[in-house]
Design a protein with these regions (language model features):
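Substrate-binding groove of N-acetylhexosamine-processing glycoside hydrolases
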Residues: 1-200
């Protein structure tokens, strides 16, 4: 069995999970059952060195480590594909370098689970190839198209309704989505209903 590790780190660091200078209590590490592995979850950071530091802290527990990454489906009705790439490529580089064998990728359903899982199929394939040590998106795109018949570049555009140009972090883009794109999509929806003769 594995436990998500933030509970131990937050106890030692007054609520902070991602601090690199946390002093983990020896008693906590010692009393963790030997059959429990730790899941280090992180979907936010874009620096490989950050993942290296966090994995190093987890190794102090002397337990098996899982890395839990994420393909961003939980910030609205469209995926955050660019931010998934920006976080998961350095994460998987660190995972390979630090010889972490167990990896899981989350697709959380926050905000009503509005984002269809299919829209991150390309991101999941890219993450899988990062785990293999392949980081060239040209190669990954060609493989993905051969395997699925779908163009990686086309699926990347799914993130556009809630993204700003050259903006990888998902926070502020949600404001744009709610103020601009959602009313536009509603207008398109109502226009299609009227043209099909369906009642409003």
């Amino acid at each position: 069995a594995h436990m998500w590790s933030d509970m131990f780190f937050r106890l030692a660091a007054e609520g902070d999970y991602y601090g690199h200078d946390v002093q983990l209590p020896a008693e906590v590490m010692k009393n963790l059952p030997s059959n429990i592995s730790l899941a280090y979850w992180d979907y936010y950071h874009t620096e490989e060195s950050h993942y290296d530091a966090m994995i190093s802290l987890h190794k102090k527990f002397n337990r098996d480590i899982w890395f839990a990454g994420g393909a961003w489906t939980w910030s609205g009705f469209a995926p955050q594909t660019r931010f998934t790439y920006a976080t998961m490529q350095p994460a998987l580089k660190s995972v390979r370098k630090n010889k972490i064998e167990n990896v899981l990728i989350t697709l959380w359903g926050d905000n009503g689970g509005e984002c269809p899982p299919f829209t991150v199929l390309n991101a999941l394939y890219a993450i899988r190839r990062y785990a293999d040590g392949e980081y060239d998106h040209g190669v990954i795109a060609a493989e993905f198209q051969k395997l699925s018949g779908l163009r990686l570049k086309t699926l990347i555009y799914w993130h556009c309704p809630i993204s700003l140009p050259h903006h990888t972090r998902p926070t502020r883009s949600l404001i744009l989505a709610r103020r601009c794109y959602i009313p536009i999509l509603f207008y398109v929806y109502m226009t299609e209903r009227r043209s099909s003769g369906k009642p409003r």
